[in-house]
UniProtKB/Swiss-Prot annotation:
Its cofactor is [4Fe-4S] cluster. Keywords: 4Fe-4S, ATP-binding, Chlorophyll biosynthesis, Chloroplast, Iron, Iron-sulfur, Metal-binding, Nucleotide-binding, Oxidoreductase, Photosynthesis, Plastid. It is an enzyme of class 1 (oxidoreductase). InterPro entries: ChlB/BchB/BchZ (IPR050152), LI-POR_suB-like_C (IPR013580), Nase/OxRdtase_comp1 (IPR000510), P-CP_red_C (IPR042298), Protochl_reductB (IPR005969), Protochlorophyllide_Rdtase (IPR016209). This is Light-independent protochlorophyllide reductase subunit B. The lineage of its organism: Eukaryota, Viridiplantae, Chlorophyta, core chlorophytes, Chlorophyceae. Pfam families: Oxidored_nitro, PCP_red. [4Fe-4S] cluster binds at D36. Pathway: Porphyrin-containing compound metabolism; chlorophyll biosynthesis (light-independent).
Amino acid sequence: MKLAYWMYAGPAHIGTLRVASSFKNVHAIMHAPLGDDYFNVMRSMLERERDFTPVTASIVDRHVLARGSQEKVVETITRKDKEEQPDLILLTPTCTSSILQEDLQNFVNRAATESKSDVILADVNHYRVNELQAADRTLEQIVRFYIEKAKTQNDLATIKTEKPSVNIIGIFTLGFHNHHDCRELKRLLTDLGISINEVIPEGGSIKNLKNLPKAWFNLIPYREVGLMTAKYLEKELNMPFVATTPMGVIDTAICIREIEAILNFTNQSKIDKEPYNFEDYIDQQTRFVSQAAWFSRSIDCQNLTGKKAIVFGDSTHAASMTKILAREMGIRISCAGTYCKHDADWFREQVSGFCDSVLITDDHTKVGDMIARVEPAAIFGTQMERHVGKRLDIPCGVISAPVHIQNFPLGYRPFLGYEGTNQIADLVYNSFTLGMEDHLLEIFGGHDTKQVITKSLSTDSNLTWTIEGLAELNKIPGFVRAKIKRNTEKFARENNISEITIETMYAAKEAVGA
């Protein structure tokens, strides 16, 4: 456990609650002290939904510590069972309440005898896993529970649908543009003649989990959540899955070809059927629907060729974005990174050959220092990299959770599929400062009234600029001023100069060979 004012992935119970609150008619009970129960506020603030967050906190206070938790937890479960009448009640501790080492499974067993709802305990080690790993595990646990329940009741729907169908697994609340991606995936799959069997957990009913085996295959758009469920269904029910994220023109085509291979394999028993071939669709979409392929050959995109960028985010979005920028737009990726340390090997394999260096860390200060050191033309990252970019005057496009309210847009903004390629192209182009715009504003917009502000990430600087030095700095065009200021301050620190004059600026210029 560590104290931080910013975490890329939250504690495990947040992931469990995200999955539980994504399903319809599932109620989560959080056994936690005050302070751990911020999920309701966070979800209500960020998600553009009208329903209440179905999470109740069973508060651990001094009375509970004195008498034990069993009575209160069981009473909360049975009360919510009567009030809400959910299909499932999911009990989860937090990392704080786990310290008490209580037998919560025993509480669940007792409450289950008094409740009409199913009651389960989230099987997550709160000290070993983060939010995303816990979400993946909880989704798999819920699916496993209902598949096994359907098996014992001989109620499992194992007969495949007549026409190709798919389960989309991993769309859930507070995800990065997940609702928009889901709509785009449905449109893409419908174009291919594939019907949607189930979408879980977002908007899914646990009563329908027994119907998962009816689909021909499972689609996992994000590695972070859904992969464990897909592997379980493959092992138990022999269901194939596609885990290639259809992000960018090239990977979308790869994903469609993988789907084509699965459909032809599943369909091979039907002798009279023509094999599925989606090459014409890929060609049509790439050339005429997606503007990204055309844009990447335009003079606008060629202006970006060779520019330096940094990418950081969850493993799915960071890896995909790195490949799109390098392969499809010719942008040089100085560093690609992810905070998903548990997925480091896969990430390194994906970005190998597309970037100069790889950074695997969940420490935002290391990411900030790396950005300050590299001084890229643009950053593509999370909300935190957006903050860093503002402090360093480097533009940033947000491409991954965690994000704030700006990235829960009301308009349609998918990142997956062919429409997603258009959104990404817009984001990339608009993130780079256009050539001379800053300079032209200064020339034609009157004299520059902007005060020079500190662009270094360290706030303990004791450097001072003389009036003459600042006046000279203000004469420098805005689009290179920040870089020159940083280089001058770096030179001053290295040479123990506390007051920066015009002479210091010229000495720094000579030192860097400019």
